[in-house]
């Protein structure tokens, strides 16, 4: 009786392995089909969208037309004596520093 039961359990386990293999293949196929549907939907959405370059150009135009709120607007030097610190000397002979 043991020989018969061990033989039938061996066949049963063989069927389980085949079923699990089938199930894995079906699950993988279902996942791939779902991914394909997702990509098709995404492609349809992209086809309906405007070109990015047109949107970027419009955005850049709006940004360029407005001054930066964090930078002060100056029309010229407020105090002309400050310019001496940012400009080089007018004559090389007057310069006493070794850098310039």
Curated annotation (Swiss-Prot):
The protein's assembly and partners: G proteins are composed of 3 units, alpha, beta and gamma. GPG1 interacts with the beta subunit GB1. The dimer GB1-GG2 interacts with NDL1, NDL2 and NDL3. Binds to NUDT7.
PANTHER family xrefs: GUANINE NUCLEOTIDE-BINDING PROTEIN SUBUNIT GAMMA 1
GO cellular component: heterotrimeric G-protein complex; plasma membrane
Keyword check for Repeat: no
Sites of S-farnesyl cysteine lipidation: 97
Residue ranges annotated as propeptide in the record: 98-100
Pfam families for this protein: G-gamma (PF00631)
Lipid-conjugated positions (S-palmitoyl cysteine): 95
Domain of life: Eukaryota
Primary residence: membrane
Cysteine methyl ester modified-residue sites: 97
Stated role: Guanine nucleotide-binding proteins (G proteins) are involved as a modulator or transducer in various transmembrane signaling systems. The beta and gamma chains are required for the GTPase activity, for replacement of GDP by GTP, and for G protein-effector interaction. Involved in the abscisic acid (ABA) and ethylene signaling pathways. Regulates basipetal transport of auxin (IAA) in roots and hypocotyls, and thus modulates root architecture (e.g. lateral root formation).
Keywords: Acetylation, Cell membrane, Coiled coil, Lipoprotein, Membrane, Methylation, Palmitate, Prenylation, Transducer
GO biological process per UniProt: basipetal auxin transport; G protein-coupled receptor signaling pathway; lateral root development; protein palmitoylation; protein prenylation; seed germination
Disruption phenotype: Hypersensitive to auxin-mediated induction of lateral roots, within the epidermis and/or cortex, attenuating basipetally transported auxin and graviresponsiveness. Enhanced sensitivity to glucose. Abnormal roots architecture. Enhanced susceptibility to necrotrophic and vascular pathogenic fungi, such as Plectosphaerella cucumerina associated with a disturbed expression of genes involved in cell wall metabolism (e.g. lower xylose content in cell walls).
Source organism per UniProt: Arabidopsis thaliana (Mouse-ear cress)
The keyword Membrane is annotated on this UniProt entry: yes
Tissue specificity of this protein: Mostly expressed in roots (excluded from the stele), seedlings (especially at the hypocotyl/root junction), floral stems, floral buds, flowers and siliques, and, to a lower extent, in leaves (restricted to guard cells). Also present in hydathods.
Protein name as annotated: Guanine nucleotide-binding protein subunit gamma 2
Chain positions found as N-acetylmethionine: 1
Residue segments, region Regulates lipidation and cell membrane subcellular localization: 90-96
Positions of the G protein gamma domain: 21-100
Coiled coil start-end: 19-55
Underlying gene: GG2
Compartments (UniProt record): Cell membrane
């Amino acid at each position: 009786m043991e020989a018969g039961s061990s033989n039938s359990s061996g066949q049963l386990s063989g069927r389980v392995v085949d079923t699990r293999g089938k199930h894995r293949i079906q699950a993988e196929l279902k996942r791939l089909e779902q991914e394909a549907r997702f990509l098709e939907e995404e492609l349809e959405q992209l086809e309906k969208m405007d070109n990015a370059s047109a949107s970027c150009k419009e955005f850049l135009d709006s940004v360029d037309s407005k001054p930066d709120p964090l930078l002060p607007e100056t029309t010229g030097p407020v105090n002309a004596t400050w310019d001496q610190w940012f400009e080089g000397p007018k004559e090389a002979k007057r310069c006493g520093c070794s850098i310039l």
